[in-house]
């Protein structure tokens, strides 16, 4: 039963991000496998007026059956040099993820990653 509620929540979040993308920060979201809502591919443009400007960065977001009560696992798959991103595995050190508040919208999470 828990997995079904997670799937419904992920459907809602995914649909919202695709109907109303974060275009002001150049972010798009897709599924890694067309029939698997638990694994997303995210593309993010580097912020203007930053050392990342002009760059296109890819991230993977993995959700488990406890989402949204548990945070997603989000990692950069594009190599990026940043104090809050592990050069080894792309793990993001972000308070939004470390101190997760259930039902935090993915739009908010992605925005916080963008402004790192």
Name each region found by the language model.
Residues 1-56, 60-116:
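UBC/E2-like fold recognition across ubiquitin and ubiquitin-like conjugation systems
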């Amino acid at each position: 039963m828990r997995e079904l509620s997670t799937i419904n929540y992920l459907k809602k979040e995914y649909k919202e991000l695709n109907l109303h993308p974060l275009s002001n920060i150049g972010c798009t979201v897709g599924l890694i496998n067309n029939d698997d809502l638990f694994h997303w591919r995210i593309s993010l443009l580097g912020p203007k007026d930053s050392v990342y400007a002009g760059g296109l960065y890819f991230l993977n977001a993995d959700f488990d059956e406890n989402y949204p009560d548990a945070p997603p696992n989000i990692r950069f798959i594009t190599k990026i040099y940043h104090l809050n991103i592990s050069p080894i595995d792309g793990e993001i050190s972000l308070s939004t993820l470390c101190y997760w508040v259930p039902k935090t919208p993915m739009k908010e999470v992605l925005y916080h990653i963008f402004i790192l």
